[in-house]
């Protein structure tokens, strides 16, 4: 686990150096206080290595933080609705999954001092299937279907929804992310939707089995977001890009208009 530098130890050193320097200058008042002479109190042993809430009265007393994340559900008025810490050892309920996907006022508190390599070294562990044999319709009421030209998807208006591709949505969880990552697998197959670069078609990638842990194959993962009645699938590997449709174009990755990134999940 990465260790947060003890900033207050640095302050103590600066304070000591500053006072030594001041003693050598005759014209400075002996009563003058150092810039670093703040009202910091030493940490008690029982506070070390513990996660503490950071309000105004406590920020000066905390020197080490845990790298577990808190998810804070906040109402539009600013009132905290729900606060919880996500851990691989916790049981996540259906309500939790819906809240994470659906709550547009969710605020993620992340450790700011973590090194990039620490944050990017994320393992996603399989949680469970949350949708089976569902259909994805875009905002133009087009359904996703297989494209005959290769391992691709396209969107079309269907009179018979039985012709649409059926997807299983599988949820994953990690200690570093508080959003809800999912995979989209074509039902009764091992073909997974795989994100590519912007404007490139998504691929249907065959896997030997449903991955129990995803570490390097993050192209298979999408953060499922729900806003009102619409669903969005943001790439974990390319976090500015969403699964999208466009007239006369294969299903691809896009950041927004003119491509359509809004979908509805239709249950079987």
Swiss-Prot record:
The record's listing under Gene3D superfamilies reads: 2.80.10.50
Disulfide linkages recorded for this protein, renumbered to the chain, are none
Q: Where is this region: Nuclear localization signal (NLS)?
A: 82-86
Q: Name the InterPro entries on file.
A: IL-1_alpha, IL-1_CS, IL-1_fam, IL-1_propep, IL1/FGF
Propeptide ranges, please? 1-112
**Major place of residence:** nucleus
Q: Report the PROSITE patterns cross-referenced here.
A: INTERLEUKIN_1
Q: How is it modified after translation?
A: Acetylated within its nuclear localization sequence, which impacts subcellular localization. Proteolytic processed by CAPN1 in a calcium-dependent manner. Cleavage from 31 kDa precursor to 18 kDa biologically active molecules.
Keywords of this entry: Acetylation, Cytokine, Cytoplasm, Glycoprotein, Inflammatory response, Mitogen, Nucleus, Phosphoprotein, Pyrogen, Secreted
Q: Which of this chain's residues carry glycans? A: 102, 141
Tell whether Cell inner membrane is among the UniProt keywords: no
In its UniProt record, which GO terms are filed under biological process? cellular response to heat; cellular response to lipopolysaccharide; cytokine-mediated signaling pathway; fever generation; immune response; positive regulation of cell division; positive regulation of gene expression; positive regulation of immature T cell proliferation in thymus
Q: Does the keyword Signal apply?
A: no
* CC per GO annotation: cytosol; extracellular space; nucleus
Using the record's annotations, give every residue carrying the modification N6-acetyllysine.
Answer: 82
What role does this protein play?
Cytokine constitutively present intracellularly in nearly all resting non-hematopoietic cells that plays an important role in inflammation and bridges the innate and adaptive immune systems. After binding to its receptor IL1R1 together with its accessory protein IL1RAP, forms the high affinity interleukin-1 receptor complex. Signaling involves the recruitment of adapter molecules such as MYD88, IRAK1 or IRAK4. In turn, mediates the activation of NF-kappa-B and the three MAPK pathways p38, p42/p44 and JNK pathways.
Q: Summarize the subunit comment.
A: Monomer. Interacts with TMED10; the interaction mediates the translocation from the cytoplasm into the ERGIC (endoplasmic reticulum-Golgi intermediate compartment) and thereby secretion. Interacts with IL1R1. Interacts with S100A13; this interaction is the first step in the export of IL1A, followed by direct translocation of this complex across the plasma membrane.
Family to which the UniProt record says this protein belongs: Belongs to the IL-1 family.
* Domain comment (free text): The similarity among the IL-1 precursors suggests that the amino ends of these proteins serve some as yet undefined function.
Annotated protein name in UniProt: Interleukin-1 alpha
Q: Which organism is it from?
A: Bubalus carabanensis (Swamp type water buffalo)
């Amino acid at each position: 686990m990465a260790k947060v530098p003890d900033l207050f130890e640095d302050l103590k050193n600066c304070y000591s150096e500053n006072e030594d320097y001041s003693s050598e200058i005759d014209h400075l008042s002996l009563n003058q206080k150092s810039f670093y002479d703040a009202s910091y109190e030493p940490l008690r042993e029982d506070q070390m290595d513990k996660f503490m809430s950071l309000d105004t009265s406590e920020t000066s007393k905390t020197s080490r933080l845990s790298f577990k994340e808190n998810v804070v559900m906040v109402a539009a008025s600013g009132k905290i609705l729900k606060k919880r810490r996500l851990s691989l050892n916790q049981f996540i309920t259906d309500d939790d999954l819906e809240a994470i996907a659906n709550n547009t006022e969710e605020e993620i508190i992340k450790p700011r001092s973590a090194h990039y390599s620490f944050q990017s070294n994320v393992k996603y562990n399989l949680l469970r299937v949350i949708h089976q044999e569902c259909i994805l319709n875009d905002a133009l009421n087009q359904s996703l279907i297989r494209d005959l030209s290769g391992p691709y998807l396209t969107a079309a208006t269907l009179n018979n929804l039985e012709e649409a591709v059926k997807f299983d949505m599988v949820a994953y969880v990690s200690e570093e992310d508080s959003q809800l990552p999912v995979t989209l697998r074509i039902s009764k197959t091992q073909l997974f939707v795989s994100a590519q670069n912007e404007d490139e078609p998504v691929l249907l990638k065959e896997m030997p089995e449903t991955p129990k842990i995803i570490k390097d194959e993050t192209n298979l993962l999408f953060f499922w977001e729900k806003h009102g009645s619409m669903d969005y699938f943001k790439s974990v590997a390319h976090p500015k890009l969403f699964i999208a449709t466009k007239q006369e174009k294969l299903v691809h990755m896009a950041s927004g208009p003119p491509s359509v990134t809004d979908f509805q999940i239709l249950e079987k």
